[in-house]
A protein has these predicted regions:
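Mature extracellular or lumenal effector domains of secreted proteins
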Residues: 2-266
Length: 266
C-alpha cells in the first residue's frame, strides 16, 4: 500500500511539473518584455516551449524585438527567413532588407540589422541552418558553423564556416569563383556582387539582385539565392529568379517550393 501511494504521489508531482512548464511556456509567448537573449536561451530555460513568436533582447543590445522561434528539431532556432508561397514579395530595396518585412508567423525576412545584433557578440558562436522543400515531397538541409554578419558599414558581409548537410554547399558554389562567403549583401538599389559585368555564356550580367529578383550575398551571382521570385509546382524549373540552391537540384535552375533560414547559438 505504501509503495502504491508513493507511486501515485510521484505521478502527481510529474503531472504538476509538466503542467507548470506548459503554463510557463505559454506565458513566455504572451509576454511583452524580453523573454531571453535569443531562442536558444528560451529553449534551454523552458524545453517545453512551443514554436512561435517571442520577444528577445540580444546580449549587449539595448533594444528588444520579436522573432519566430523554431522549437522543434533540436530546439532553439531563431528564424530569419521563411518562404512558402508568393504572397510576400522579396523583390525589395536595401531599407526593407535591413529592417525586415512580412508576417513572422508566415513568410518573412527578419532584417539584416537584427541578425547582426544577434551575432555581433564575439564570445558566442552561431550555426546557420537552411531547410529546403521541393515540389515532389522531398526535403534537404545545409548547416554552417561559425555564422556571422558584419555591420551595415560593411554591407552586412556574410561569414560561414564548416558545411554539413545533404543539400550541397551552395554558399561556396557549385564551381570555383562564386564563393559567397565573405561577400556583402546586395539589393536592387545597392550592388555589391562583384559583376562589372559578369559573363555567363552570351549573357552579360551587371546586377545579380536585379536578375535574381531579390536581395542576397551575391558573388558573381553564385549558386545560392533563396529570395527570388516564388514559382508554383509545374512552373518551377528554368527561371533566372527563384528560390535557388543549385548544388541541390542541378543542372537546370530549380526553384524550391519552400525554404527556411535560421540560426542557433552554440
Amino acid at each position: 500500500m505504501q509503495v502504491r501511494m508513493l507511486t501515485a504521489a510521484g505521478y502527481g508531482f510529474i503531472s504538476a511539473l509538466l503542467l507548470s512548464c506548459s503554463i510557463h511556456a505559454k506565458k513566455l509567448q504572451k509576454a511583452g518584455s524580453p523573454q531571453g537573449t535569443d531562442c536558444t536561451q528560451i529553449w534551454k530555460l523552458t524545453p517545453q516551449a512551443s514554436s512561435g513568436v517571442y520577444v528577445i533582447q540580444p546580449a549587449g543590445v539595448k533594444t528588444h524585438f520579436k522573432v519566430y522561434c523554431e522549437m522543434r528539431l533540436d530546439g532553439g532556432w531563431t528564424v530569419f527567413q521563411k518562404r512558402s508561397g508568393g504572397n510576400v514579395s522579396f523583390n525589395r530595396k536595401w531599407e526593407a532588407y535591413k529592417n525586415g518585412f512580412g508576417n513572422q508567423t508566415r513568410d518573412h525576412w527578419l532584417g539584416l540589422k537584427k541578425v547582426f545584433l544577434l551575432t555581433k557578440n564575439k564570445s558566442m558562436k552561431w550555426t546557420m541552418r537552411v531547410d529546403l522543400w521541393d515540389h515532389e515531397g522531398g526535403t534537404a538541409y545545409a548547416e554552417y558553423k561559425n555564422f556571422r554578419l558584419k555591420n551595415e558599414k560593411a554591407a552586412f558581409k556574410l561569414h560561414v564556416g564548416k558545411y554539413t548537410g545533404n543539400a550541397g554547399d551552395a554558399i561556396r558554389g557549385a564551381y570555383p569563383g562564386i564563393n559567397q562567403d565573405g561577400y556583402s549583401f546586395s539589393t536592387v538599389d545597392r550592388d555589391n556582387d562583384g559583376c562589372s559585368p559578369c559573363i555567363f555564356g552570351d549573357i552579360a550580367e551587371t546586377e545579380c539582385a536585379l536578375s535574381q529578383g531579390g536581395g542576397w550575398w551575391y558573388s558573381k551571382c553564385g549558386s545560392a539565392s533563396l529570395n527570388g521570385e516564388w514559382h508554383p509546382t509545374g512552373e518551377h524549373i528554368g527561371w533566372s529568379s527563384g528560390l535557388h540552391w543549385l548544388t541541390w537540384k542541378p543542372p537546370a535552375p530549380y526553384s524550391a517550393k519552400a525554404s527556411q533560414m535560421m540560426i542557433k547559438s552554440v
